[in-house]
Amino acid sequence: MLSPKKTKFRKQHRGRMKGSASKGNTIAFGDYALQATEPVWLTSRQIEATRRTITRYVRRGGKLWIRVFPDKPVTARPAETRMGSGKGAPEYWVAVIKPGHILFEITGVPQKTAQQAMKLASYKLPIKTKFIVRNTTES
């Protein structure tokens, strides 16, 4: 599972997910991509499950890029604990995703294969996504 090796602080505020993605919203590496259309916190487990699904479907062909990384710790209190006495310990890591952010990119496979792989991958994610193709006019 993905998680940072080292962070400056152990815990973070929850924050807000306002607006749409201004960075990471264009295809940079591959020919086909899966783009988020809703805001979400993607857990490292969800990212890993999606990665496995795509690599299993395309088998040995193609190259996959994961364009998101879970760098935000989410804390949780133990079950049946009274209120107070500070914030809970970090439980898992999430990637903050805004609408328009590219999640995965793929190349080296036919468009039909890439589209089916991304469709199967989208079932592992808790949001609506969109399959996009790199413009051939871009250089």
From Swiss-Prot:
Family matches, as SUPFAM superfamilies: Ribosomal protein L16p/L10e (SSF54686)
Source organism superkingdom: Eukaryota
Gene3D superfamilies associated with the record: Ribosomal protein L10e/L16
Biased composition (Basic residues): 1-17
Subcellular localization(s) per the UniProt record: Plastid, Chloroplast
One GO CC annotation: mitochondrial large ribosomal subunit
One GO molecular-function entry: structural constituent of ribosome
Region Disordered, residue ranges: 1-23
Family to which this protein belongs: Belongs to the universal ribosomal protein uL16 family.
Subunit structure: Part of the 50S ribosomal subunit.
Name listed for the protein in its UniProt record: Large ribosomal subunit protein uL16c
